[in-house]
Amino acid sequence: MCIRDSAEYVATLEEGLKVDPKNKTMVKNYGLHYLKAGLAAQKAGKAEEAEDCFKKVIPLDHKQYKTNALYSLGVLCYNDGANILKKAAPLANSDADKYAAEKEKADGRFKEALDYLEEAAKISPENENVKKMLPQVKAVMK
């Protein structure tokens, strides 16, 4: 669970959503819980936990939350790819094979970022954050 103190709350929401997946209040509370938990995990440097939290929001029938989760996943993947490249940079001249392997990992994360952001753009083409982030990801993939 992303936030231990609220395990019972989340379990109740999950059970409720199984019975009534269109219940707007439960969808909103569940989505908001996992968006906040994902952002908190991201700030704490727990990227995997953040990714898991954001992914729980994607299936929900809530345009704004889904867009925010996809955007957050895109940023998370982009940052991960950038960190992989940064750590691999010193290897570029000393160990070309290892650098190439790390660059391939980074490119995979950039591709994931692009996929998430493009999906977010389809759902909410007006979203300014998505519009700003997409060209950055595309530029780094050239």
Protein language model features and the residues they cover:
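Conserved small/polar residues in nucleotide/adenosyl-binding loops
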Residues: 1-6
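TPR alpha-solenoid repeat register
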Residues: 26, 33, 67-69, 98, ...
